[in-house]
């Protein structure tokens, strides 16, 4: 018992001694203290490795001198604006002359510019740059047009000449419709399309078309009675669209080599138009395309495949239709449809394109001046009364096989025809063929 009491007393003395000296049994792990601003390690940029010196960006030296004068080293790239556009200072470079006699580049931002507004058109709008109580001026232009996402959507009236800005890719429909002040429009390179009725019933006299133009809407120059000339020859259009020049007073229309079709009534009632060369790649001429036009002569390509009915109906001044170019044999149904040249009393020469295979009825009904006619070798069918009631006297048929005729009575040529000359080896075939046998006594071999 005595030994237990001694042991407990010893333990109590040991605990009291430890508390006085604060001796920890195990030292705690301290959390690292946060870095101060001066002690933070520098972050290494990507791409650097340990031991390589870091490249620091060059900084402009702080200029202690006073700015005395501003000069424009380079104007902004954009000095031509349209209605509603925001200020664009890209490319603008200013130089400052300082009191130490040295020049330094000066940074400029929109806050330094006064006088800018694109809410109204301005031929010469002066803008002022204000920096450290020094000023310099430059001029911009605000055109009387509005452009949205590359589309010309509005043109203010009261201007006789408009130059489109370089960012226009399309002209919206009816933009110039009814504008009786406009005389000239210069279209920008980069423009690819013009919407329908864009110049309908306007006073436009001249249009400069870009080489990038590819698409035309319908009725673009309908009722433009002051337009004298349309040069589309260097464009990329493939279709001359319906009604594009109806009632326009164009005297000359130049078409591009890319053109493939002339649509319905494209040049109808163009009374002052004198001459047209149809480009070699054109395969299609639509219904009444040249109806009541003033053309005197027309050249058709030998590769054409379709001339729709009444294409040249009632062209009273038309005297000559000639052909040119290589022959295309790609259209087995290539045809000149009915009544194409009816109402052309002065027509004295008619050449049929050598690609044609079918001749429609009544092609030159009523004409008395076409006396000689050659039917090309590819023609395989001649329809009812194709050349009846005309002044045709001499016919040359190149095909060895007689072209087919409709069943029943055939009035392919007038009763007054004097000779039908065919290949020598085919004379008998023609004399006995249906329809042709009616003219047997006038059929003879070509010399």
Model regions: which residues?
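Sec-dependent bacterial lipoprotein signal peptides
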Residues: 1-16
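Bacterial Sec-dependent N-terminal signal peptides
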Residues: 15-66, 134-143, 147
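Short, solvent-exposed loop/edge segments of extracellular or virion-exposed proteins
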Residues: 36-40, 71-82, 151-161, 325-328
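Solvent-exposed, low-complexity, repeat-rich "mucin-like" stalks and linkers
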Residues: 66-104
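Serine/threonine-rich, repeat-prone extracellular segments and beta-strand-based repeat modules
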Residues: 78, 102-138
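Structural signature of tandem-repeat unit edges
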Residues: 80, 156-170, 180-193, 202-215, ...
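Consensus positions within tandem repeat domains that build extended binding/scaffold surfaces
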Residues: 173-175, 195-198, 217-220, 241-244, ...
């Amino acid at each position: 018992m005595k030994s237990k009491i001694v042991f407990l007393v010893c333990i109590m003395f040991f605990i009291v001694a430890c508390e006085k000296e604060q001796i920890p049994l195990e030292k705690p792990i301290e959390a690292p203290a946060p870095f101060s601003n001066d002690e933070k390690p520098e972050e290494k940029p990507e791409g650097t490795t340990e031991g390589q010196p870091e490249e620091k960006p060059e900084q402009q030296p702080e200029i202690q001198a006073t700015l005395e004068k501003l000069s424009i080293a380079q104007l902004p790239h954009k000095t031509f604006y349209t209605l509603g556009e925001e200020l664009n200072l890209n490319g603008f470079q200013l130089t400052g002359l300082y009191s130490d006699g040295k020049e330094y580049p000066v940074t400029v931002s929109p806050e330094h510019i006064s006088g800018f507004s694109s809410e109204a058109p301005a031929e010469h709008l002066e803008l002022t740059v204000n920096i450290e109580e020094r000023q310099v001026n430059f001029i911009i232009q605000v055109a009387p047009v509005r452009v949205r996402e590359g589309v010309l959507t509005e043109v203010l009236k009261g201007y006789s000449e408009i130059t489109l800005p370089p960012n226009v890719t399309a002209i919206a429909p009816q933009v110039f419709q009814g504008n009786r002040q406009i005389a000239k429009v210069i279209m920008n390179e980069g423009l690819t399309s013009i919407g329908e009725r864009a110049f309908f019933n306007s006073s436009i006299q001249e249009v400069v078309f870009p080489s990038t133009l590819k698409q035309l809407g319908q009725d673009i120059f309908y009722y433009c009675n002051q337009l004298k000339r349309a040069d589309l020859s260097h464009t990329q259009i493939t279709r001359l669209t319906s009604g594009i020049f109806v009632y326009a007073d164009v005297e000359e229309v130049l078409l591009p080599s890319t053109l493939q079709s002339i649509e319905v009534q494209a040049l109808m009632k163009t009374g002052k138009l004198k001459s047209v060369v149809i480009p070699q790649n054109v395969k299609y001429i639509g219904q009444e395309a040249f109806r009541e036009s003033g053309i005197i002569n027309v050249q058709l390509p030998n590769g054409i495949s379709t001339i729709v009915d009444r294409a040249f109906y009632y062209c009273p001044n038309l005297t000559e239709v000639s052909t040119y170019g290589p022959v295309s044999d790609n259209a087995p149904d290539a045809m000149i449809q009915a009544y194409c040249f009816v109402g052309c009393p002065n027509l004295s020469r008619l050449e049929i394109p050598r690609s044609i295979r079918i001749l429609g009825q009544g092609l030159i009904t009523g004409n008395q001046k076409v006396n000689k006619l050659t039917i090309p070798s590819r023609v395989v069918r001649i329809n009812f009364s194709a050349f009846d009631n005309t002044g045709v006297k001499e016919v040359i048929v190149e095909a060895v096989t007689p072209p087919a005729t409709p069943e029943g009575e055939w009035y392919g040529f007038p009763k007054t025809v004097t000779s039908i000359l065919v290949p020598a080896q085919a004379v008998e075939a023609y004399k006995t063929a249906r329809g042709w046998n009616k003219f047997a006594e006038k059929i003879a071999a070509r010399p």
